[in-house]
């Protein structure tokens, strides 16, 4: 009996693999203009993180202007995350209700104006308030981005589409680290915020004018539009057809897989925000670098993360096309990346600047790619694509709940110990924990209905 069952499972696996290969051949020759949307997501997140890194590079100048301590700067670094966290789920619900276009250009304009306000701040209080407004605007980026990916990306391209979204962030951090340093030296720290904010306003106008859903995009061929719509996955399970957004949110919160994804994102997000907020200060304090060199050495790990992230995003989609259990392959890849990123634990024990750069580059590239793959895995596991916006919100909330703590905890650790060794230790332990969580927790489909969807075999669906 076991032998017979094994043969049946083997035949089913071979049949599925052959079907996937036929599907892949069937889209050969279909245009890929949808990649313009993926590039648009890259640019969107590029500007998002350009505005974020501005504060990190300008931190030394701002601290001198207002006579701020490391603890004071820790609160300034994390201020935008407070409103960011509060607004994530509302922004996800708005993205699901109104789509990616309206929510994106509105909030992009808002956070760009908040960046300009940061440059115009005249006190610690106004500086803090400007970062709170920045958090409101930027909280929509990933929920809207996740919604746009579900609207535009066939399932076999969600990895690379998510990589474009996430790598735009690291491209912004890479270029911004150098660009903002040069702007500060040339014009001053206030002017750097004016210039980066103006770039965002221009992008908001462009997004309003150019972006449309596939159904309304006149520049798409009929064949490409049909391919996109056939794999969107917005048909709900029967029990969830009339589900309200609030009930959908409750269903997500009851899903063990959703909670595991969010916790994994948090373990990875702590390290990301540690680098994003304190990396320039770490390099300046421990290596005695000036503003321009600090920006340059901060840029290198982000550049590596952007390039490697796109490559690994493409590779994860290749795994999906070849494997009979694609979600398991993506999950395993995330765990491996988190384990590799824990090389940050070795940072306090090396002295050479090139070796420190290498360790940070590997850690940042792996953690950034793991977070991008987590977005793709969420879309893969979510059965009802109509609620991808709020699902992405919960995922990003997990990342940013931990991320909010990173700059504050690091500030206290640095103030108490006079160094960064303890900060790197905390990050490394969380990365190891995240690898365990993703392997053990995110194994089943994310269902919003209370009644499980049962396949023809009579057994509840399970992802291995």
Place the predicted regions along the sequence by residue.
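Conserved MFS/SLC helix-loop-helix module at the cytosolic interface between two early adjacent transmembrane helices
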Residues: 86-125
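Helix-breaking motifs and short loop linkers at transmembrane-helix boundaries and internal kinks
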Residues: 67, 99, 120-126, 137, ...
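Central cavity-lining transmembrane alpha-helices of secondary-active solute carriers
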Residues: 78-92, 299-312
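Cytoplasmic helix-loop-helix junction between adjacent transmembrane helices
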Residues: 130-171
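Helix-loop-helix hairpin linking two adjacent transmembrane segments in secondary transporters
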Residues: 165, 169-218
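Extracytoplasmic gate region of multi-pass secondary transporters
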Residues: 55-56, 250-313, 371, 375, ...
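C-terminal transmembrane helical hairpin of 12-TM major facilitator-type secondary transporters
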Residues: 327-374
């Amino acid at each position: 009996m076991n032998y017979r069952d094994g043969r049946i499972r083997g035949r089913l696996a071979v049949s599925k693999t052959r079907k996937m290969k036929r599907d892949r051949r069937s889209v050969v020759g279909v245009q890929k203009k949808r990649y313009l949307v993926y590039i648009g997501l890259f640019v969107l997140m590029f500007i998002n993180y350009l505005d974020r890194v501005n504060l990190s590079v300008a931190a030394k100048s701002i601290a001198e202007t207002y006579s701020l301590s490391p603890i004071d700067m820790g609160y300034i670094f994390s201020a935008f995350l407070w409103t960011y966290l509060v607004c994530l789920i509302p922004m996800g619900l708005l993205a699901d209700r109104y789509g990616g276009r309206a929510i994106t250009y509105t909030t992009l304009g808002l956070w760009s104006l908040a960046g300009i306000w940061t440059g115009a701040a005249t006190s610690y209080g106004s500086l803090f308030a400007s970062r709170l407004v920045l958090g409101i605007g930027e909280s929509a980026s990933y929920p809207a981005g996740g919604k746009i990916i579900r609207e535009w990306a066939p399932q076999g391209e969600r990895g690379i589409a998510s990589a474009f979204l996430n790598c735009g962030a690291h491209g912004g951090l890479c270029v911004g680290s150098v660009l903002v340093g040069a702007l500060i030296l040339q014009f001053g720290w206030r002017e750097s915020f004016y210039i980066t904010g103006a770039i965002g306003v221009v992008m908001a106008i462009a997004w309003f004018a150019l972006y449309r859903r596939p159904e309304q995009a006149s520049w798409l061929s009929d064949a490409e539009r049909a391919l996109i719509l056939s794999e969107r996955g917005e048909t709900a399970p029967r029990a969830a057809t009339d589900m309200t957004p609030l009930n959908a949110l409750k269903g997500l919160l009851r899903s063990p897989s959703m909670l595991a994804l969010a916790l994994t994102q948090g373990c990875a997000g702590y390290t990301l925000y540690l680098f994003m907020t304190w990396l320039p200060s770490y390099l300046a304090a421990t290596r005695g670098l000036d503003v321009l060199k600090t920006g340059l050495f901060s840029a290198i790990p982000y550049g590596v993360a952007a390039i490697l992230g796109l490559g690994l995003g493409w590779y994860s989609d290749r795994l999906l096309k070849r494997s009979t259990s694609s979600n398991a392959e993506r999950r395993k890849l995330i765990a491996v990346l988190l384990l590799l990123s824990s090389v940050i634990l070795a940072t306090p024990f090396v002295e050479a600047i090139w070796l420190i750069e290498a360790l940070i580059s590997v850690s940042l590239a792996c953690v950034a790619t793991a977070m991008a793959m987590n977005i793709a895995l969420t879309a893969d596991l979510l059965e009802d694509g109509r609620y991808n916006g709020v699902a992405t919100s919960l995922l990003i909330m997990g990342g940013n709940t931990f991320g909010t703590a990173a700059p504050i905890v690091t500030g206290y650790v640095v103030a108490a110990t006079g160094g960064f060794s303890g900060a790197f230790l905390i990050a490394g332990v969380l990365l190891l924990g995240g690898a365990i969580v993703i392997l053990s927790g995110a194994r089943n489909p994310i269902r919003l209905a209370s009644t499980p969807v049962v396949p023809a075999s009579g057994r509840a669906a399970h992802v291995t």
